[in-house]
UniProtKB/Swiss-Prot annotation:
CDD domains: GlcN6P_deaminase. This is Glucosamine-6-phosphate deaminase. The keyword Hydrolase applies. NCBIfam families: nagB (TIGR00502). PANTHER family: GLUCOSAMINE-6-PHOSPHATE ISOMERASE. It comes from Streptococcus pyogenes serotype M18 (strain MGAS8232). The active site is at residues 62, 128, 130, 135. Keywords: Carbohydrate metabolism, Hydrolase. Its EC number is 3.5.99.6. It holds the Pfam family Glucosamine_iso.
Length: 234
């Protein structure tokens, strides 16, 4: 696990984009993408770039259950607004949060991941150490699955909604075992509220109580943090 400290989120996005360009030069074809505030500066760099992404495939980590793709809080909408509308890909995959059978949708998504191995996976990290929507207690062996969101996650995500009551209580998420199959992982974290999770991820025991701790076992993880998020690493 390599730690890169940056001045701010803007610099973090630039570093992540440089890593992506290196990966593309080596033949990467499938990107694993995340939502939330952490990767936005990275997506801004992608949008500003003259690079053409139309031969790439993207696979997103997760989607809320019960939200239409037209909802401005859906992750499908987020990705279109922040990246896909400006930079078309060959194919974009996200879980279908309105699937009639969400368990079957999870299995369908696993098949997509199997057919498109992820070369470059972007991650954020939750205050409780979650990656994707894999909450504390999630089995490291889990693949794509339906998640009951913890109160801390609902509270953290409520800033994007009119009220906390509007935040969905479930999501479909790529599992930890799925994430660990990625050839390269770039995790972005900014702000003091992420410091405890980053410390546990880097130095703590590998435990399902802190899902991101499993990344210690991955061969190629780069963590990009500002000084606030890295404040407990010294």
């Amino acid at each position: 696990m390599k730690i890169i400290r940056v001045q701010d989120q803007i610099e973090g996005g630039k570093i992540a984009f440089t890593l992506l360009k290196d990966s593309l030069a080596k033949g990467a074809k499938t990107l694993g993408l995340a939502t939330g505030s952490s990767p936005i500066s990275f997506y801004q760099e992608m949008v500003k770039s003259p690079l053409d992404f139309s031969d790439l495939t993207s696979i997103n980590l997760d989607e809320y259950v019960g939200l239409s793709v037209e909802s401005d809080q859906s992750y499908d909408y987020f990705m279109r607004q922040n990246l896909f509308n400006a930079k078309p890909f060959k194919k974009n995959y996200l879980p279908n949060g309105l699937a009639t059978n969400i368990e079957a949708e999870a299995k369908r998504y696993d098949q997509i991941i199997a057919e498109h191995p992820i070369d470059f996976q972007v991650l954020g990290i939750g205050r409780n150490g979650h990656i994707g929507f894999n909450e504390p207690g999630t089995s490291f062996k889990e693949e794509t699955h339906v998640v009951d969101l913890q109160e801390s996650t609902i509270e953290a995500n409520s800033r994007f909604f009119t009220s906390i009551e509007d935040v969905p209580k479930q999501a479909i998420s790529m599992g930890i075992a799925s994430i660990m199959k990625s050839k390269m992982i770039v995790l972005l974290a900014f702000g003091q509220e992420k410091a405890d999770a980053i410390k546990g991820m880097v130095f703590g025991p590998i435990t399902e109580d802190l899902p991101a701790s499993i990344l210690q076992k991955h061969d190629h993880v780069i963590v990009i943090v500002d000084e606030a998020a890295a404040s407990q690493l010294d």
